[in-house]
């Protein structure tokens, strides 16, 4: 067997003919009814006799007495006085026969040359046959005789008859009518002559043909040669031995084609040439000689006649290249009768079969030069969704005419027996193929033999429908059966039995038939003109090749137009049929596949035209219709064709085809082209193939020459051995090379690709549509990668559920799918992994989205439902446990109101907006919008429910309730926005950018700056004044987002600092963390410290389990003013709310809860405790985060919830000026000792989880919740802060929350620390801190604990380290606190503008302050606690990014090790707490990505949404258009890495002291990959700090004053102004040692004395490298070098991705080579998946890639786990590209904010500071004009700028006021109005880049949301 290597032009070369074993054909056909007469001799003479004159029939003649219907055959039939004329004929072989008979109208026509006229009768009378008077014109009969020497196969007249058409007679079968009436008089009937032509029968013996030779000898695997059948089709009339007259010439070869249909309905096309060769007389027996007439019967004398036999050479192929094959076979035949030739025939055959490449789209034409004079062209088959066929519609129409074609269509549709016949065998196959193709989408189901061999003619008697083609000579031997419809292609006639006489085209539905006929009648004349032109002299005007090309082009065009006419007809009669398909929606029964179960036949019939009910009824009962319904209902190889047919119906009848009619805006149906040529068909690209090389001529004439007289016996030795076919030009093999998985699931049909291309072109001109088109393509990318994602996911059900959730998310976010690939892939995966119920849900989701599944999707759906195992019973364990869960949840709901009231009384909280969203948070954000007005209780309830569901454990209900009582998450806060019109600043509690994105008006009323919730206001009032709070919030918000907002310090430390992760919005954080992130966000918003911790924990865990869901939860949460007081509760509430909305949107909502749950579960035993803690933290967070959005930032955190912060607060409480703002009720604090103890237990692998849990339980539930939350936050400390969250939510709260940020993530500042908060809050923070990072956190804790008697508190071996550290720290702490507090308060104040809820700070603080009880009054807590939180220790110092936030003391970042702990849990089975810190700690790599690019032409910075708007609808164009100079350039994605694996924290091993927060590097399975990485990164910072318990320096965070970094550190950090850490050897306790880490910078907070923390490295994702270098004694790994790849439009990326997967299989996505070999596709996918918050395992490839491991490819372990270790931040700006001397305003603001000592600022800095402050205030008052004027005044005329005023003001607003508080749409409106109102003087000073963004840019941002700034 020969292996198949892709498409071949030809498969086999065959020679057939007479063999030694051939049997007589008569034996084969004796069974048939043969005519008794046998073949007749041809007619040699005709005559006219006048019977009325007494003339008789001449001798030897036969008179035609009667017509076929037995009327008198009088040529003047029906005339009154005319003579009776009759026609006589004579047969014989003695002279040449007649070849034609005609009628001559004398005087009107001239006689054709070669014809003779019968002027007289044999008796001399005039032979005028006209019945009119003698005076009128005469009519004579003419004839033409064959020449004496003629070819054997020439036709002759073999029969003659007369018909009277006025009596209804028609020509008999196979007779040709002479279309001239013989009677032209007034009277008489219409009489016509008919005659039949055939090949005169010679003496012959017919045998069954056999195989003489084949090449190659071996069979192909896919198509073995049938050696017995093929020869029959090569010689359908048999292999004959014939005896010819001596003067007979050899006929020219006859070309014929045939089709072999295999059992699988696959067609093989044959092209054959028949010719004659002499046969030796010696080989004949006497019997044969007698039969042939070569031996006289009596004398036995030999007769001198020639003996010949026929032979055939044939090519077999899967492709109908009939014309090319004809030319090649003729070339071979000519070689066989000529010579000499340098090469044998065998060489030419093997060259053609092996060396000719298959035509491909790149090389659509192959010109094969066979010899000097012979060439042929192979053209790529027309690529349409219609089935491939050898149909020749033009031949069909030319031979039958329009009306006969329509009648034939009726017969085929109603499944009649159809017999096609012609004397031209080459015509039969093309016409038969056209007859079968014209009923598309139906497929003929019965016997189909286009050229039937005589030996198979018995099929004509079969009792079932068939389409068969035969040679017309068959009728010389046999009469056709009565019930067969015979179509004579030679005479353009249809012959029908009597019962079908009345069946014709008029029975077809009127309108469709009328349209069909009109089109065919229009095309009919064009066909004849094309044929005439090509015959007439085209060869004279152009070369044969050119003539060939042009003729082929015209014919192809006509072919398609004819085929399209039939396609329109079929679409018209079947329109709307999909409505009547019945999907299987339950476990299938035996009758599920019956046609009546699958299709509503009665409904379909009722919807059709009643006048044609009979036609439709008959049609619906045919096999073709029933099969069509089955193919529509199940997967079949016809699916692409059926989908194309559905598209045709939709184009022609937009109202009937689908419900989704908005896509159809085509021209009128008449003009719509249904079949379109590929571009490749129009291509002139031709490959030239030379003939085989002759042997070298060395002049000695030794090389043999080949000369032939007849066709030789071929010698296999002379053939070239079959090589592998050269597929250099060929397309990829049709068989998929993909192993294991089914062929590319997400593959689009060609039609879908074309439709998407058209749609994109149409959308391109419409800004909203263009943005949605890009958005939709991005979702498609995710679904294309889904099969691979599911394959590496465990369990599969969760991955499938995630996919389903994404589908719901798409619908809810108004994504208009470009095709059905998304749904189809999910359905196929449901089948692959056996989840039919989910497939049913997907189908109903399609219906909900008003999308009608096309044939492909519907087929896969039914296949899945039919073949997959259905669950046996609803009473499964899952079902029963679900019932239990519902009962428990119901009980919890009843308890909520009670707890809420308690909480409210206890807590006064600031409401926070959502913190940054998790990976999948966008959806949630949007949802939040809707939920903004949901009451807090409801939100809380939802949150609780979800949380419970996810954990599947009953968490402390009270804690949850507390959460609920907290202010509802940000989303809700917008309810209270002021009534100002289009205000830029939203309500503080407003969500991030998402909310505004979803609807600029929404509840926000398009406010530029949102107002706070009433609750928020109250809280703010408590805190101090709104203004202060706002500032704080701003600062705080800054922190979290800032952290990862910028690229690394290496590239530009300053940039990084500014963009540090802290800057990143909480939403970013959320994005990274998944659902947990959202929770974190909320937490941040509340008391920053505890929230931070909480958030961290939450997001990581949630992320791991259910990224999307958890995220959703977060976003959706609302803040309730009442609840704001307790940060933790708020957070929980928020998450709940988020969850619920998400749930509506997508199951992912549940995921949020799950995430939350998973966080808890991450630390297995810790789960319950953590959960409690989380809820508490959430509450706290909420309060502290004024807007959840700000939660992540801890800028405002004055008093952290973490133990350190609390301690600090206690110590410095009174000292902080802002402390009043931050009064936290002491209730929040928990028992510090308990917390620490439990925390330690958690961390240590040996510690008993239960004990730690008990400790938590002992504390009030709220505290427990807080603690958990805090942990989460801790984890998150490294997460970026939400930009939005900071200032936007509530200025006041921001200010108040200035507590020290613990981690970079939490850059909250706590301006004032609330004494009341001190004790308990601190303890909370401490415990949280400890949990997250036993060592590092502890250190910070110690600092804050200065006031506590740690000896008493701490006991047991685990606490030894903590004790010693704390003692030392305590002494220093009080002093440090003062400094730190002051610094913080300063930054807090700035931040106040931002608002407490700045995500980062709040979140971290919360995390740290796990102990804080939810009840604690959060108003105070927010600012101070956040500031205090130790977690954010390193954040403020680390980088400017953190911005102004100093988290000197409180910021001790939790080492990422926390995350490691989670890993450890899974690895070592120890239950570690899953606090945010741990999440951060588990982060091994932070990846910062920005699409901001620089235009090559004008140098301007072009941002993401501008790049999107500049892309074109061309899926091959990589360029975008610069919005300013309109030039094209290639945008780039810039990627930077912060490798945190070298940090000790990441690799911490569990230690006896329980400090091993950084337990393994392996995340828990339940943690979501993406989130984890983020958190772990941040965490390590915090944790590092735990190594040196003494170094709690940053604890000062709580105090409110920041420690000044030492000069060395300042130098080291470069622009990182926030970093004010001095590396203190052992005295970490020194205040100056505070570390700030900026997410974007990427350095660790290692300013702390590393000597003391040998095993935890602080890994700060965004810390500046310089910082890392200075601080990291461990010798952290160098960061991998940055990467830049082209930023591809989703259209281009999709095309490339599909091509890649088709060539390499979809498993390539999750192989280690993907990132190395396809970096462009990889990074673009990572960018888009992250952009849309879609779960993905791709980030896991980053960790093991060569690039990130110094050129060594590490083995892949667990993608899902590794992905959790990578935190990806998408940055809006790229400071590395900034080339202006002045730094961006938002960077300046961050820097001023972080260093809050105005006395230290230079004069220039002071001016800038004033400018920035003025702009901020203007924006708050909705005034954009003033900032434009101020900035324009500062511009130097004529100096080219990169940064536009628009970006300067917008970015400053987002960073300083909090991203969640800015309505970007409102800002755009205000900016546009202000710009248009500028005076011409100012406009002259402005540049093009300062113009407002275009509508297209705005829509792209609205669709995709804004990245982090």
From Swiss-Prot:
Sites bearing Phosphoserine, chain numbering: 703, 737, 741, 965, 968, 973, 989, 996, 1003, 1046, 1061, 1099, 1126, 1184, 1225, 1244, 1252, 1278, 1325, 1337, 1346, 1623, 1627, 1629, 1640, 1799
Main localization of the protein described in the UniProt heading: membrane
Domain cDENN residue range list: 385-521
Biased composition (Low complexity): 1426-1440
Cellular component, GO, one term: retromer complex
Keyword Transcription: no
Key words, A-Z: Cell membrane, Cytoplasm, Cytoplasmic vesicle, Guanine-nucleotide releasing factor, Membrane, Phosphoprotein, Protein transport, Transport
Bias kind Basic and acidic residues: ranges: 1459-1468
Pfam families: dDENN (PF03455), DENN (PF02141), uDENN (PF03456)
Database matches in PROSITE patterns: DENN, MABP
Description of post-translational modifications: Phosphorylated in response to insulin.
Protein name: DENN domain-containing protein 4C
Natural source organism: Homo sapiens (Human)
């Amino acid at each position: 067997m020969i292996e198949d290597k892709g498409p071949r032009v030809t498969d086999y070369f065959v020679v057939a003919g007479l063999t030694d074993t051939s049997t007589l054909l008569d034996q084969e056909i004796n069974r048939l009814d043969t005519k008794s007469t046998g073949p007749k001799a041809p007619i040699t003479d005709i005559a006219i006799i006048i019977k009325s004159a007494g003339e008789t029939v001449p001798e030897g003649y036969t008179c035609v007495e009667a017509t076929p219907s037995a009327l008198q055959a009088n040529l003047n039939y029906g005339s009154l006085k005319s003579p009776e004329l009759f026609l006589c004929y004579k047969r014989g072989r003695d002279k040449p026969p007649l070849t034609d008979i005609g009628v001559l109208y004398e005087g009107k026509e001239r006689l054709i040359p070669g014809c003779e006229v019968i002027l007289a009768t044999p008796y001399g009378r005039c032979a005028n046959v006209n019945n009119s008077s003698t005076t009128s014109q005469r009519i004579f009969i003419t004839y033409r005789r064959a020449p004496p020497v003629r070819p054997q196969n020439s036709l002759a007249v073999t029969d003659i008859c007369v018909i009277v058409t006025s009596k209804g007679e028609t020509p008999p079968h196979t007779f040709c009518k002479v279309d001239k009436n013989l009677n032209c008089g007034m009277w008489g009937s219409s009489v016509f002559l008919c005659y039949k032509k055939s090949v005169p029968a010679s003496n012959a013996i017919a045998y069954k043909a056999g195989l003489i030779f084949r090449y190659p000898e071996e069979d192909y695997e896919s198509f073995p040669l049938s050696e017995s059948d093929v020869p029959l089709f090569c010689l359908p009339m048999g292999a004959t031995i014939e005896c010819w007259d001596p003067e007979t010439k050899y006929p020219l070869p006859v070309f014929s084609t045939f089709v072999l249909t295999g059992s699988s309905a696959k067609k093989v096309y044959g092209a054959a040439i028949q010719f004659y060769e002499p046969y030796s007389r010696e080989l004949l027996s006497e019997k044969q000689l007698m039969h042939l007439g070569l031996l006289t019967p009596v004398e036995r004398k030999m007769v001198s006649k020639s003996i010949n036999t026929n032979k055939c050479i044939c090519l077999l192929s899967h492709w109908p290249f009939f014309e090319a094959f004809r030319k090649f076979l003729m070339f071979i035949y000519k070689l066989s009768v000529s010579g000499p030739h340098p090469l044998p025939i065998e060489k030419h055959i093997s060259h053609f079969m092996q060396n000719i490449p298959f035509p491909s789209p790149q090389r659509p034409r192959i010109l094969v030069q066979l010899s000097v004079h012979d060439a042929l062209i192979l053209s790529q088959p027309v690529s349409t969704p219609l089935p491939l066929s050898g149909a020749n519609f033009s031949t069909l129409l030319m031979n039958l005419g329009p009306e006969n074609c329509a009648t034939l269509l009726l017969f085929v549709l109603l499944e009649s027996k159809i017999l096609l016949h012609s004397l031209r065998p080459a015509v039969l196959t093309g016409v038969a193929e056209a007859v079968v193709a014209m009923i598309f989408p139906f497929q003929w189901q019965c016997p189909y033999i286009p050229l039937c061999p005589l030996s198979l003619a018995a099929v004509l008697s079969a009792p079932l429908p068939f389409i068969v083609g035969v040679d017309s000579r068959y009728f010389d031997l046999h009469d056709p059966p009565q019930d067969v419809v015979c179509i004579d292609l030679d005479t353009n006639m249809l012959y029908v039995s009597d019962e079908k006489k009345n069946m014709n085209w008029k029975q077809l539905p009127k309108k469709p038939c009328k349209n069909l006929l009109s089109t065919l009648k229009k095309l009919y004349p064009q066909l004849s003109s094309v044929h005439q032109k090509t015959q007439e002299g085209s060869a004279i005007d152009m070369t044969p090749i050119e003539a060939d090309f042009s003729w082929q082009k015209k014919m192809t065009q006509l072919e398609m137009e004819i085929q399209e006419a039939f396609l329109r007809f079929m679409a018209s009669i079947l329109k709307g049929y999909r409505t009547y398909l019945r999907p299987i929606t339950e476990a299938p029964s035996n009758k599920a596949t019956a046609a009546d179960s699958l299709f509503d036949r009665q409904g379909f019939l009722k919807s059709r035209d009643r006048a044609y009910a009979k036609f439709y009824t008959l049609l619906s009962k045919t096999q073709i219709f029933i099969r069509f319904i089955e193919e529509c209902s199940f997967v079949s190889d016809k699916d692409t064709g059926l989908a194309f047919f559905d598209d045709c119906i939709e184009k022609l009848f937009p109202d009937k085809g689908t419900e989704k009619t908005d896509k159809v805006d085509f021209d009128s149906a008449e003009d719509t082209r249904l079949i379109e040529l590929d571009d490749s068909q129009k291509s002139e690209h031709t490959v030239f193939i030379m003939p085989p090389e002759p042997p070298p001529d060395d002049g000695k004439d030794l090389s043999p020459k080949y000369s032939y007289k007849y066709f030789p016996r071929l010698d296999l030795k002379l053939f070239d051995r079959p090589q592998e076919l050269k597929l250099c030009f060929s397309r990829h093999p049709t068989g998929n090379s993909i192993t294991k998985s089914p062929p590319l699931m997400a593959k689009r049909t060609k039609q879908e690709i074309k439709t998407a291309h058209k749609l994109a072109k149409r959308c391109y001109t419409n800004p909203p549509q263009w943005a949605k088109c890009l958005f939709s393509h991005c979702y498609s990318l995710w679904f294309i990668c889904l099969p691979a994602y599911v394959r590496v996911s465990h369990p599969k059900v969760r991955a499938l559920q995630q996919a389903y959730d994404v589908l719901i998310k798409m619908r809810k976010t108004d994504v208009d799918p470009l095709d059905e690939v998304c749904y189809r892939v999910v359905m196929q995966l449901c089948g692959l992994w056996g989840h039919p119920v989910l497939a049913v849900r997907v189908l109903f989701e399609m219906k909900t989205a008003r999308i009608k599944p096309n044939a492909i999707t519907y087929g896969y759906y039914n296949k899945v439902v039919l073949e997959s195992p259905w669950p046996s019973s609803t009473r499964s364990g899952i079902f029963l446990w679900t019932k239990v869960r519902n009962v428990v949840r119901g009980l919890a709901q009843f308890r909520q109101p009670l707890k809420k009231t308690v909480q409210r009384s206890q807590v006064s909280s600031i409401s926070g907006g959502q913190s940054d969203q998790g990976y999948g948070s966008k959806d949630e954000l949007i949802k939040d919008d809707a939920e903004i007005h949901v009451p807090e209780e409801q939100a809380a309830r939802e949150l609780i429910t979800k949380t419970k569901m996810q954990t599947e454990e009953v968490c402390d209900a009270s804690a949850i309730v507390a959460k609920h009582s907290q202010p509802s998450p940000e989303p809700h806060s917008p309810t209270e926005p002021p009534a100002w019109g289009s205000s830029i600043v939203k309500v503080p509690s407003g969500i991030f950018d998402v909310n505004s994105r979803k609807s600029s008006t929404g509840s926000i009323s398009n406010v530029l700056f949102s107002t706070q919730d009433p609750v928020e206001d109250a809280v703010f009032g408590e805190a101090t004044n709104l203004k202060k709070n706002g500032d704080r919030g701003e600062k705080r918000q800054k922190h979290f987002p800032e952290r990862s907002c910028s690229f690394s310090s290496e590239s530009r430390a300053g940039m990084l600092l500014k963009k540090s992760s802290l800057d990143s919005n909480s939403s970013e954080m959320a994005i990274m963390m998944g659902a947990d992130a959202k929770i974190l966000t909320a937490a941040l918003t509340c008391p920053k410290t505890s929230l931070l911790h909480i958030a961290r924990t939450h997001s990581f865990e949630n992320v791991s389990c259910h990224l999307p869901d958890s995220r959703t939860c977060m976003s959706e949460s609302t803040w309730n003013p009442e609840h704001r007081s307790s940060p933790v509760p708020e957070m929980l509430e928020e998450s709940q709310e988020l969850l619920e909305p998400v749930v509506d949107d997508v199951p992912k909502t549940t995921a949020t809860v799950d995430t939350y749950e998973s966080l808890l579960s991450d630390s297995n035993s810790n789960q319950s405790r953590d959960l409690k803690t989380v809820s508490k933290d959430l509450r706290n967070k909420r309060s502290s985060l004024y807007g959840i959005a700000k939660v992540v930032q801890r800028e405002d955190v004055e008093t952290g919830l973490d133990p350190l912060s609390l301690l600090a607060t206690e110590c410095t409480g009174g000292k902080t000026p802002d402390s009043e703002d931050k009064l936290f009720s002491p209730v929040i604090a928990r028992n510090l000792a308990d917390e620490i103890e439990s925390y330690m237990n958690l961390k240590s692998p040996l510690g008993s989880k239960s004990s730690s849990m008990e400790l938590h339980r002992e504390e009030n539930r709220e505290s427990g919740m807080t603690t958990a939350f805090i942990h989460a936050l801790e984890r998150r400390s490294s997460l970026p802060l939400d930009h939005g969250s900071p200032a936007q939510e509530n200025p006041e709260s921001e200010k108040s929350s200035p507590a020290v940020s613990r981690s970079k993530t939490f850059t909250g500042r706590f301006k004032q620390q609330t004494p009341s908060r001190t004790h308990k809050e601190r303890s909370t923070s401490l415990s949280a801190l400890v949990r997250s990072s036993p060592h590092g956190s502890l250190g910070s804790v110690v600092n804050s604990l200065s006031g506590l008697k740690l000896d008493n508190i701490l006991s047991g071996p685990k606490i030894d380290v903590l004790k010693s550290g704390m003692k030392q720290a305590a002494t220093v702490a009080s002093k440090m606190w003062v400094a730190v507090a002051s610094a913080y308060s300063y930054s807090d104040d700035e931040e106040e503008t931002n608002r407490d809820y700045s995500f980062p700070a709040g979140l971290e603080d919360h995390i740290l302050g796990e102990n804080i009880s939810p009840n604690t009054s959060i108003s105070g807590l927010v600012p101070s606690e956040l500031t205090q939180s130790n977690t954010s220790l390193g954040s403020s110092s680390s980088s400017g990014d953190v911005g102004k936030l100093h988290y000197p003391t409180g910021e001790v970042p939790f080492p990422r090790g926390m995350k490691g702990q989670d890993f450890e849990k899974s690895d070592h089975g120890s239950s570690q707490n899953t606090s945010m810190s741990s999440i951060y700690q588990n982060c091994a790599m932070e990846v910062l990505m920005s699409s901001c690019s620089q235009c090559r032409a004008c140098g301007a910075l072009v941002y993401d949404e501008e790049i999107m708007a500049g892309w074109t609808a061309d899926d091959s164009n990589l360029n975008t258009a610069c919005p300013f100079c309109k030039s094209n350039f290639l945008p780039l994605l810039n990627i930077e890495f912060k490798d945190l694996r070298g940090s000790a924290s990441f690799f911490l091993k569990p230690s006896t002291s329980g400090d091993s927060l950084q337990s393994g590097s392996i995340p828990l399975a339940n943690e979501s990959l993406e989130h984890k990485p983020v958190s772990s990164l941040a965490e390590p910072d915090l944790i590092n700090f735990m190594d040196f318990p003494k170094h709690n320096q940053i604890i000062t965070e709580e105090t409110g004053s920041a420690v000044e970094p030492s000069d060395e550190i300042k130098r080291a950090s470069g622009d990182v102004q926030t970093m004010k850490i001095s590396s203190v050897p052992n005295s970490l306790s020194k205040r100056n040692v505070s570390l700030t880490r900026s997410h974007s910078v990427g350095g660790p907070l290692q300013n702390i004395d590393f000597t003391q923390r040998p095993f935890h490295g602080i890994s700060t994702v965004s810390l500046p490298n310089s910082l890392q270098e200075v601080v990291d004694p461990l010798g952290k790994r160098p960061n991998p070098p940055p990467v830049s790849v082209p930023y591809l439009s989703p259209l281009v990326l999709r095309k490339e991705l599909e091509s890649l997967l088709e060539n390499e299989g979809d498993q390539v996505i999750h192989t280690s080579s993907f990132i190395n070999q396809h970096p462009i596709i990889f990074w673009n996918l990572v960018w888009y998946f992250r952009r849309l918050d879609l779960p993905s395992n791709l980030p896991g490839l980053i960790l093991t890639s060569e690039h990130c491991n110094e050129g060594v490819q590490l083995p892949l372990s667990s993608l899902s786990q590794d992905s959790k270790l990578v935190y990806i931040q998408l940055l809006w700006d790229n400071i590395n590209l900034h080339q202006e001397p002045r730094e961006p305003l938002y960077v300046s603001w961050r820097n001023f904010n972080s260093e809050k000592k105005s006395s230290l600022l230079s004069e220039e800095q002071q001016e800038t500071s004033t400018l920035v402050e003025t702009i901020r205030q203007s924006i708050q008052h909705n005034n954009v004009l003033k900032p434009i004027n101020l900035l324009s005044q500062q511009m130097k005329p004529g100096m080219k700028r990169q940064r536009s005023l628009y970006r300067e003001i917008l970015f400053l607003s987002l960073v300083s006021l909090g991203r969640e508080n800015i309505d970007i749409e409102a800002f755009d409106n205000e900016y546009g109005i202000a710009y248009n109102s500028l005076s011409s003087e100012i406009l002259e000073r402005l540049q093009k880049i300062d113009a407002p963004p275009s509508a297209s840019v705005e829509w792209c941002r609205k669709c995709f949301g804004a990245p982090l700034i």
